[in-house]
């Protein structure tokens, strides 16, 4: 039997395993929250042949990649495995893993797997077309990416898997299970299944029963930062961690990212600027939006929820623009030894606020109940090359991302009554100083940018540390460890310009959605079941 380690005897480092959409990372931190080393590997989630919308999660291959990252991080840190006081895991949300009665993982899908479009439509018709509203009022989730239609899809198309299913967890819980052999979920990640009650932070089995599905496959629920188990001998041999090292319950990537940013008190607000942009506001008590426009998720802080309004493909749109139109700028930036985005921001800083009226049409404001977007386009272009060029379009994209953020925050405030007085801007987007200032000018809020802009792994490490007594409180530790890089105050003149631009964009976007409705253009993205 493996001997159990405590943090006092095993060393002064914590490990976070971060299973993102595009990659998996093992990150080692010291007890001051400083990142010491990281091992990272990209992974892909491939479609199943003849299963439209599918995004399979390769359990065997991805576990090998996770082990590779753990070994790489230990090697880079030049520390023995005994120096790791505890390990915790976080992941993309919505992705689920199915286990059989022997505890073997037998099926998994990634976060935006959309194979169950027919099942979403079928479920919406239950209870005189009120089932989705019942799910939302209880869990804060709609059916589009929840576990309910995916389980129904398995019942319809893979009964061999469905009837063998004994337990379901999230991907972060799967990583912790592979390390410890113990199965449990945490509220922050499991909340995105649409099966967790926001008030009790526990399963609402009746939702599965209403859908005609089995309700005996739900794992125990444990709070983030509590002990799950210990590294097994088998896992130790696979990934070179020390058998007996504590494994601590982790959580969802966004909520743990907020913990790492110190966004842990009611009314605190963050904009997380990655591939998607998440506008997140902490609410003091569970409440849902009567219009079902935004999602409500359990925070990792017990008793607290977060309302989240999502901008779609914001970071991806910027990357598309850079790669499709800015080959020259990429070469120049490489010669100068700077990032291409920095060069493009420098060019865009010479364009006046409002970008000469150019209106990008990409992500809409979040409309969770009926979630789709207009066709990607630029509206109101000019053929004057002095006014309409790459710098103008790049600035217009940054301004538009901030406008969509402001609209998302406004609809959160409208139903919750929680009005932010400042916000934290993190993620890759916050590296841009111009973008950070534009966000301040558009929202009219002071924007705080942290030193650690990718804070999910830090939040996960905080959970690990709390679990073994390094720290006593998630919230207090998050506030203690966050450090600030810079602050951006809004410019009142620019705010007035952007208010007008925002009103025009909202009107134009509505017309662009009508073109999708009429079958004349193709949506940027449409939720399953629409």
Curated annotation (Swiss-Prot):
Catalysed reaction, written as an equation: (S)-4,5-dihydroxypentane-2,3-dione + ATP = (2S)-2-hydroxy-3,4-dioxopentyl phosphate + ADP + H(+)
A GO biological-process term: quorum sensing
Subcellular location(s) per record: Cytoplasm
Signal peptide extent: none
Gene3D superfamilies per the UniProt record, alphabetical: 3.30.420.40
Keywords: Cytoplasm, Kinase, Transferase
GO MF term set: autoinducer-2 kinase activity
SUPFAM superfamilies for the chain: Actin-like ATPase domain
UniProt keyword Kinase present: yes
Pfam families, sorted: FGGY_C (PF02782), FGGY_N (PF00370)
Enzyme class: transferase
Keyword Transferase attached: yes
Gene Ontology cellular component annotations, sorted alphabetically: cytoplasm
EC number: 2.7.1.189
Primary location class: cytoplasm
InterPro entries assigned to the protein according to its UniProt record, in alphabetical order: AI-2_kinase (IPR033676), ATPase_NBD (IPR043129), Carb_kinase_FGGY (IPR000577), FGGY_C (IPR018485), FGGY_Carb_Kinase (IPR050406), FGGY_N (IPR018484)
Domain of life: Bacteria
Role this protein plays: Catalyzes the phosphorylation of autoinducer-2 (AI-2) to phospho-AI-2, which subsequently inactivates the transcriptional regulator LsrR and leads to the transcription of the lsr operon. Phosphorylates the ring-open form of (S)-4,5-dihydroxypentane-2,3-dione (DPD), which is the precursor to all AI-2 signaling molecules, at the C5 position.
Family assignment from sequence similarity: Belongs to the FGGY kinase family.
Protein name, entry field: Autoinducer-2 kinase
Lineage: Bacteria, Pseudomonadati, Pseudomonadota, Gammaproteobacteria, Enterobacterales
Gene: lsrK
